[in-house]
Curated annotation (Swiss-Prot):
The protein's required cofactors: Mn(2+)
Organism: Leptosphaeria maculans (strain JN3 / isolate v23.1.3 / race Av1-4-5-6-7-8) (Blackleg fungus)
InterPro entries: Aminopep_P_N (IPR007865), Creatin/AminoP/Spt16_N (IPR029149), Creatinase/aminopeptidase-like (IPR036005), Pept_M24 (IPR000994), X-Pro_dipept-like (IPR052433)
Protein's UniProt keywords contain Membrane: no
Details of cofactor binding: Binds 2 manganese ions per subunit.
A GO molecular function held by the record: manganese ion binding
Binding site for Mn(2+) 1: D369, E492, E532
Family: Belongs to the peptidase M24B family.
Protein name: Probable Xaa-Pro aminopeptidase PEPP
Gene Ontology biological process: proteolysis
Tree of life domain: Eukaryota
Length: 562
């Protein structure tokens, strides 16, 4: 016998048929209230049919699935007992969710202002705790609008992240000051230049900037030196700036002290932990990039060249008003996937089995970074499926091990140990697992770090990497140390069959004993498999910000659906 459970998630109500022998209490979160009937015995068997959903409906259903069951979603074509509709309030009688994941309702969060003042206070607090001047002033500059060399065309503009973090302002040629004792944030934007208006239209006005940004005052850039002089004379204080980001026309002469070493590390440290608004931006970037990844999966079987699929991804992002990419897309078919940062994206697609797509858009200076590997024609061959399952297991286990305070080095080690077990099972590696780990032989297949912080930069600040590490397993690990709550980190294990990397191991007297070259020969054509999600670290665990399909049945169904 089954019953219908009603669950409300983000203003929409789901009807789910569940097994009658269900004990909800052990697995529902505290925020869920159940109707007071006797507990049942087992978890519900939840099945989801996504085929008729809009993109928003799919997102809601995925939210529900992630929160209420650990079972993966089945293929989209399967009929299931799952239904979706809006119910009147009087019919919502089983349970409802009263709170959400952090910034899960990102559209609502982003209706507010970017929290520039909160960031400024956070940076000032760090400076003061390090012995800085509590009466000081922070000064930052936006990126200058530049022309391409030898012509009058404008170069692509990318806002300075240090400036944006304390302003939320995307305008070039701007300045800001933050007076620490007065908690006063002032933005300086370019004035109206009549000749420029002829070509580019009216720029943002001072009043518009005051309304848009989380600032206390706004002036034009003509006022910056007068403002700095008045601030320094009134406080006889210290100016904090980034030396290589101070224009020649700016004067700090009237300040008692000029401090050029603390501000940059202060901002880099503070950027590691994210506000709700920042998390909302990363969620939105992930949602847009997910739609683009799905579009590529659906287009893959008919593509003739990697560049066609890169175009599909870019088109999907731009259609959703995400015109900037967080990094150059990697669209690698077959053995091209063995090159970690392959960016040529111009090779023909013919007999290759796999496509590795590492691509993510940027939303208001915040990045997404997603990698999916899938069979171009919708069917894995034996070798590629075996490697894919190992990498997927690496990612699942590593994500499940995460929470605030976890040592990232240990998660990276876990990924290698899972890879070793999988490669031993396939016969690619041979011998004792511990001996293979100690010899670092698995680095031949997994040479990069497990992940990196994500935020305004794809490889975000604060990771404390040690690229001089003599231990090859950790040399390219971009994050060292423990993970703080509210940091966002990528988890991107991979296994690659790159001759340039592996062949030296086959010639090494100490390490060659661990490789079966005859078995290895069957796997060169796999190229590389990488799976990457963006993970928010919480006190008790994680929230996965990346809803992009990755289970075998999901991705094969999407490719075949074309």
């Amino acid at each position: 016998m089954t019953r219908t459970m009603v669950v409300t998630v983000r203003f929409c109500t789901f009807l789910i048929n569940v097994d009658d022998e269900w004990d909800a209490n052990p697995w529902l979160p505290e925020q869920v209230s159940l109707d007071p009937r006797p507990p049942l015995k087992h978890r519900p068997k939840l099945n989801f049919d996504m085929s008729a959903f809009s993109s928003r409906g799919m997102r809601l259903a995925r939210t529900l699935q992630r929160r209420y069951t650990r079972r993966p979603l089945p293929t989209y074509q399967q009929p299931t007992p799952f239904t979706f509709r809006i119910l009147p309030a009087e019919d919502r009688e089983w349970c409802s969710i009263s709170t959400m994941a952090i910034a899960e309702n990102y559209e609502d969060v982003l209706k507010g202002k970017y929290p520039a003042k909160e960031h400024a206070r956070k940076v000032a607090k760090w400076i003061i705790e390090k012995g800085g001047d509590k009466n000081g002033t922070i000064y930052l500059e936006a990126q200058k609008q530049k022309l391409n060399e030898d012509n009058d065309g404008e170069a692509p503009f990318r806002q300075r992240r240090y400036f944006f973090y304390l302003s939320g302002c995307e305008l070039p040629d701007s300045y800001l000051t933050y007076e620490i004792p007065n908690d006063r944030l002032t933005l300086f934007i370019p004035p109206v230049e009549p000749e420029e208006v002829i070509w580019s239209g009216l720029p943002m006005s001072v009043d518009e900037a005051k309304a848009k940004y989380d600032i206390d005052d706004c002036k034009t850039t003509r006022d910056i030196n007068a403002h700095l002089t008045s601030t320094s004379e009134s406080a006889q204080s210290t100016i904090y700036a980034i030396p290589e980001q101070v224009s020649d026309n700016i004067t700090f002469l009237s300040y008692k002290d000029k401090e050029f070493k603390q501000l940059k590390p202060a901002i880099e440290y503070c950027r590691v932990t994210k506000t709700d608004y920042e998390i909302a931006l990363i969620r939105k970037a992930n949602e847009i990039s997910t739609a683009a990844h799905i579009a590529v999966m659906k287009a893959a079987s008919k593509a003739k060249n990697e560049c066609e699929l890169e175009a599909v991804f870019l088109k999907s992002c731009v259609e959703r008003n995400a015109k900037n990419q967080a990094y150059h897309s990697i669209v690698a078919a077959g053995e091209n996937g063995a090159t970690l940062h392959y960016v040529n994206n111009a090779a023909p697609i013919s007999e290759q089995n796999l496509l590795l797509l590492d691509a993510g858009c940027e939303v208001d200076c915040y990045a997404s970074d997603i990698t999916r590997t899938f069979p171009i024609k919708g069917h894995f061959n034996e070798e590629s499926l075996a490697i894919y399952k190992i990498v997927l297991d690496m990612q699942h286990q590593c994500i499940n091990a995460l929470k605030a305070g976890v040592l990232w080095d240990s998660i990276h080690e876990l990924a290698h140990k899972i890879a070793i077990k999988g490669l031993l099972d396939l016969g690619i590696l041979k011998g004792d697992a511990d001996a293979i780990f100690k010899a670092r032989a698995s680095v031949a297949f997994f040479p990069h770090g497990l992940g990196h912080y994500l935020g305004m930069d794809t490889h975000d600040t604060g990771g404390n990497a040690n690229y001089a590490d003599k231990d090859v397993m950790f040399r390219y690990l971009r994050v060292r140390g423990t993970l703080p709550e509210r940091s966002v980190i990528t988890v991107e294990p991979g296994i690659y069959f790159c001759r340039f990397i592996i062949e030296p191991y086959l010639k090494d007297e100490e390490k060659k004993q661990f490789f079966d070259e005859k078995v290895l020969e069957k796997y060169w054509s796999v190229g590389g498999v990488r799976i990457e999600d963006n993970i928010l670290i919480t006190k008790e665990g994680i929230e996965n910000l990346t809803p992009t399909p990755k289970e075998v049945d999901e991705i094969t169904a999407l490719v075949q659906s074309a």
